[in-house]
Amino acid sequence: MSKYHGLCAVRYGKHVAHKAPLMVIALAAGLFAGCLSRPALTRQLFTFATPATRSSAGPKNGRVLAIRHISVAAPFAGQSFVYRTGELAYEQDPYAQFLVVPEEDLQEPLRGYLLNSGQFEAVTEAGSALKPTLLVEISVPQLYGDFLNRTEPAAVLEISFTFFGAPNGLPDKMISQKSYHQRIPLKARTAAALMAGWNEALRRIMDQAAHIAAM
């Protein structure tokens, strides 16, 4: 058995399921308690927080930003929370999940933060009837809970932004590209604390990224 006590031990469940289905339930009850504190086998669903829209009207500068697409690195693109348990070892937790896949879950929060930056008259999604003057492609290379050091668990989030001019509503030359990384210590070893850490990481990243929007 892993020293992480099966921290979301998907591998163990798959390994024994065809031999002893009842044993899987018993194993899971103990295994899943090793990383996060929560009732055993209770499925929890979470979402990124969307910031409140600022009451002041956006600048009438004619700048319309369209989020062309959001992509999340394949290891972290599913609904299940992912935990780092070794230098090159990660495990998925089927009992702590995003409500929808992360790339969809991040759409509204990112749009809200970009709109609140005060740099754009509007921030739209791909396919909007509103013609953009700028486009942004957003990628998320890292999105996981780091439990490699069991005494210092943390929420890890990295986001990269690539802005393009769009004089005709289509991508033109690249204007800027920047990546931001945040590591937030967890206040508790719970899925809710991990989600809170990711939300704080997102807030800090968007505060840092606000100056990109001003280019």
Question: What do the PLM-derived regions correspond to, one by one?
Answer:
Residues 61-132:
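N-terminal segment of the mature soluble domain
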Residues 88-97, 168-211:
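Short secondary-structure boundary motifs at beta->alpha junctions and helix caps
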Residues 1-18:
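N-terminal secretory signal peptides that target proteins for export/translocation
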Residues 36-56, 117-170:
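Surface-exposed short loop/turn segments
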